[in-house]
From Swiss-Prot:
Compositionally skewed regions (Acidic residues) per UniProt: 310-319
Organism encoding this protein: Sclerotinia sclerotiorum (strain ATCC 18683 / 1980 / Ss-1)
PTM: Phosphorylated in response to DNA damage.
Record GO biological process: DNA recombination; DNA repair; DNA replication
Family: Belongs to the SLX4 family.
Matching Pfam families: Slx4
Biased composition regions of type Polar residues, renumbered to the chain: 612-623
MF (Gene Ontology): 5'-flap endonuclease activity
Name this protein carries in UniProt: Structure-specific endonuclease subunit slx4
Length: 922
């Protein structure tokens, strides 16, 4: 029967394959997962041996012993593989076992001994025979039970009895000692009457009998089952489970005494627990393996640096490895085999000893790594000597750039660099923490050498004032800085800045963008609502003058008499200069730019005769007969002269054509002669032609004897010349100017009368520049004869009273005359008068009562609120009683108000925009 049992256990090769997989199951059972109790890993941490190269399964204690003593343990290895199949059979029996089966107790024999009886199962091994084969099988089954205790400590196992040598009893006792986590059943009283310890009643086990006095007992195999659910005695189970790895039998054999003491000595660490199976098997062989295993437990800590086998499968092993620090690893190398201290003491001693050891190693590494740095520093010195092509950016920032040589870094008193010995050329230091004295002694020598190369020195921290001065002396050119800096011309940048500043300097008086379109008023044409358009503004240069046309200032240039021959022979009542004398433009205004100065020349006798013949030419009526339907057909003769001339500058006739009588194609051709673009508006074309004609003929008239600084006298004589030329061109047409022109050409006695008549034409000239009325209606002879309103004499009260135009009041003419009169003799008086006027304006604005309406503040409140001041409105407010209240009886022009605002830095603007219309918003 025993032979049959052996055949059943050793059979079924497929179960051997399954047993290899189940020897270390990857996951615990379902009941363990539900109860929340982790399966303990007996092989983990530092006690785990590395995986052999040719291993196919997980290594165990038997495989390690087999490698150390393969000859003596070969039989045990064969028996080990044979028992594995029996263990698998027992695992299968656990699943089919009934829950209440292990509660049955074994019956007592007649001799007083207790027989171990387990519940009969279908596949378990029954009573064994007492022959040699049965004893061998019992040993194998006992070893299988021990394997179950190692791998699955929570599952119950059957206990075996040994009838032959008593070895099975010792093995069973070791099994009890190695199963701390399993619940056990109550044990009966042995043959001597001693009580055994009561185990956990959760899983009952068969009662044991102590093998003493040679009594043989045959153990029964117990049916293994899965752990049940928690019973009512859960508290007692938990209390018994807390004591792990410390439960031993009260009565142990003499051979196991030393094993129990060893386990108690090392219970603090379960990784160093001895293996009782290996000790029992190897003890009889006499190879000294037990002592080797003891030495192995003491020598285990240095192997903690190796990766364990079950590192990924067991999270507890990972936590135990990660908890060890670097100091612990270093301290393990300083372990002495003669020390008997615990692991904690060895780690602590390793930390204290390892700190000094690591410092020495770091010092050695630093000394060795500093050796190749010295030639590296020499190479950087050679690179610093090389001169590079400096760019503009480098030149500008050289004053602030610090030297980037490695020597400067070594010489700098940085605390961190003082601990590096590569600063010393010799590199000899005692302990690595002392500062070498030689770099400091050599630092001034290196600085002297760098000063010879010409590199920039370290800048000194300057005060704000000196720093601003240094910045102002630097020359920066913004743009592309890829060009190399040229050092041959250091003054090039300064000259460039001076030229740019000179080009940006513009005279505010000549800037057309400073003043509004009513700038003609300040030039002698009164406060005119002139039709300045885009073309007339675009055709002017930076000074506001027409381009490609020689112009003079209309306001500040004295107007000469048109009739140069006759006027040169008559004496002047006001000014009688010599024949070669005239007023220079520079004497009138010294601030005028040289571009607007008129070249002065003297008219010779040949030119006078030519001009006289042109005025008395008989071919003019033929040219003007085509346009006899016009009001002034004689003016077409002047146009014919203009057509004959190649350029407008060659026209010497002082009479301006009547552009109002021209047709649109004729106006277009006239504009093309002045090299202007085509203009669609007829009114704008006429205004542009009038301005061009006046600017064209002024230089020829400015060199005659009639250069009187009084503008009104010059304008009177100019209108007189227009009347004379009209009567000479066409004598057949009855005109009131005909007789007067003959008197002017025949005798000089009628000069006072001509002056009196020219008073009227002076006002006509103002209307030509100020009003929107066509020139044909303004220059009609009926208006000049029928005007009966008296006109106040501005400068010459000796002349007879002439009628004033109906569209101009006395106050307006007085303001125009005050704005137009400028004399170099009265410049200082004008400045003093202007300063006095500014004082009165300031007093009038500040003394005015504040406004009660928040939406209509006073002028002073507007200035304080930084509101833009409308010059025309402020001038009208000052002239309506504000100035008279502060003691100023005269009126003020908007231009003077503008100058006062600019002197006080007040934001001001004109009511009229650049297009000639009123501003819609401010």
């Amino acid at each position: 029967m025993a032979t049959t049992d052996v055949f059943i256990i050793s059979s079924s090769p497929p179960r051997r394959l399954v047993s290899h997989i189940a020897s270390s199951p990857p996951l615990p059972s379902l009941d363990k997962m539900v109860n929340g109790k982790k399966a303990s890993n007996l092989r983990q941490g530092s006690s785990v041996a590395p995986i052999p190269t040719g291993a196919t399964i997980f290594a165990s204690a038997s495989t390690l012993l087999r490698e150390s003593s393969s000859g003596s343990l070969q039989g045990f290895d064969n028996a080990r593989s044979f028992v594995t199949s029996a263990v698998q059979d027992e695992n299968d029996l656990k699943k089919s076992a009934k829950p209440k089966a292990p509660r049955k107790t074994a019956p007592k024999k007649e001799d007083g001994t207790v027989e171990k009886v387990a519940k009969a199962s279908r596949k378990t091994v029954k009573k064994k025979d007492k022959d040699v084969s049965g004893d061998f099988v019992d040993e194998l089954v006992g070893e299988a039970a021990e394997i179950i205790a190692e791998k699955k400590p929570r599952k119950p196992r059957a206990k075996k009895g040994d009838n032959a040598e008593g070895k099975s009893g010792s093995v069973a006792e070791a099994t009890v000692e190695k199963k701390p986590r399993k619940s056990r059943a109550k044990k009966a009283v042995d043959a001597t009457g001693e009580d055994l310890k009561e185990k956990v009643p959760r899983k009952s086990r068969a009662k044991k009998t102590d093998v003493e006095a040679g009594i043989e007992t045959v153990p029964k195999e117990k049916a293994v089952r899965k752990p049940r659910a928690k019973n009512s005695d859960l508290d007692s189970n938990l209390q018994s489970k807390m004591v792990k790895g410390r439960v031993t039998k009260s009565a142990v054999n003499a051979s196991n005494t030393h094993k129990v003491e060893t386990s108690k000595a090392d219970t603090g660490n379960k990784h160093f627990a001895p293996n009782p199976i290996v000790e029992d098997i190897v003890a009889d062989e006499g190879f000294g393996l037990v002592e080797a295993i003891r030495r192995r437990t003491n020598w285990t800590p240095p192997k903690s640096t190796k990766v364990p086998i079950d590192l990924e499968d067991s999270p507890e092993a990972q936590e135990s490895d990660t908890s060890k620090g670097f100091a612990e690893l270093l301290g393990s190398f300083g372990y002495s085999s003669y020390q008997a201290d615990s692991i904690e003491k060895r780690i602590s001693s390793g930390v204290s000893n390892g700190a000094a050891a690591t410092r020495k190693r770091k010092l050695i590494e630093m000394v060795t790594t500093n050796i190749p740095r010295e030639p590296g520093s020499k190479t950087t010195k050679e690179k610093a000597v090389k001169k590079k092509a400096r760019t503009l950016t480098d030149l500008a920032t050289s004053a602030y750039a610090t030297a980037e040589d490695d020597d400067n870094l070594l010489d700098a008193p940085t605390p961190l660099l003082q601990y590096f010995p590569h600063a010393a050329p010799e590199g000899s230091t005692n302990n690595g923490f002392k500062i070498p004295p030689k770099p400091r002694s050599k630092s001034p020598m290196k600085r002297v050498q760098k000063s010879k190369t010409g590199s920039a020195e370290e800048p000194i921290l300057l005060s704000p004032e000196s720093a601003m001065k240094q910045v102002s002396n630097q020359d920066f050119v913004f743009g592309t800085s890829s060009q190399l800096a040229r050092e041959d011309s250091p003054s090039l940048l300064r000259d460039l800045h001076d030229a740019m500043q000179a080009s940006n300097e513009l005279d505010d008086y000549d800037d057309p963008f400073v003043s509004p379109p009513t700038k003609i008023a300040e030039r002698g044409k009164a406060v005119v609502a002139a039709k300045r358009n885009l073309w007339s503004i675009a055709a002017r240069d930076n000074h506001g003058d027409l381009m490609d046309v020689e112009t003079i200032d209309l306001a500040h240039t004295p107007v000469a008499k048109p009739d140069r021959i006759m006027l040169s022979q008559k004496p002047s009542s006001l000014v009688t200069p010599g024949k070669d004398d005239w007023f220079d433009i520079d004497e009138i205004e010294d601030n005028r730019p040289p571009s607007t100065q008129v070249p002065l020349r003297e008219t010779g006798p040949i030119e006078r005769s030519i001009n006289f013949q042109l005025l008395d030419s008989p071919t003019q009526p033929k040219n003007t007969s085509k346009d006899s339907s016009k009001v002034f057909p004689q003016k077409k003769g002047t146009k014919s002269l203009v057509d004959k001339s190649t350029t407008p500058k060659k026209v010497d006739a002082s009479k301006m054509p009547d552009y109002e009588s021209f047709t649109t194609p004729q106006l277009t051709r006239e504009i093309q002669k002045y090299k202007f673009k085509q203009i669609k508006s007829r009114k704008r074309m006429i205004d542009l032609l009038i301005q061009c004609y006046e600017s064209q003929n002024r230089p020829a008239l400015g060199v005659l004897q009639g250069n009187i600084p009084i503008i009104t006298q010059n304008s009177l004589e100019k209108s007189k010349d227009v009347a004379d030329s009209s009567t000479q061109v066409k004598p057949t047409i009855p005109s009131p100017r005909r007789g007067r022109a003959k008197k002017v050409t025949t005798s000089t006695a009628s000069l006072p009368k001509s002056k009196a008549k020219s008073k009227m034409t002076d006002t006509v000239a103002f209307l030509e520049m100020d009003s929107d009325t066509p020139l044909s209606k303004i220059r009609t002879p009926q208006k000049s004869r029928k005007g009966k309103q008296p006109l106040e004499d501005i400068f010459d009260s000796d002349h007879p009273i002439t009628p004033s135009p109906p569209r101009r009041s006395d106050s307006q003419i007085r303001k125009i005359s005050k704005a137009l009169e400028l004399s170099p003799d009265n410049n200082q008086d004008d400045e003093a008068q202007q300063a006095q006027l500014f004082t009165h304006i300031y007093t009038a604005i500040t003394k005015a009562p504040p406004s009660q309406d928040p939406f209509n503040p006073s002028w002073h409140e507007k200035i304080l609120l930084y509101d833009p001041i409308i010059l025309e409105d402020l001038a009208s407010w000052l002239n309506t009683g504000a100035l008279s209240k502060v003691g100023w009886d005269e009126e003020v022009a908007p231009l003077e108000v503008k100058k006062w605002c600019e002197s006080k830095s007040i934001c001001c603007l004109w009511k009229e925009n650049q297009g000639g219309g009123a501003r819609s918003r401010y």
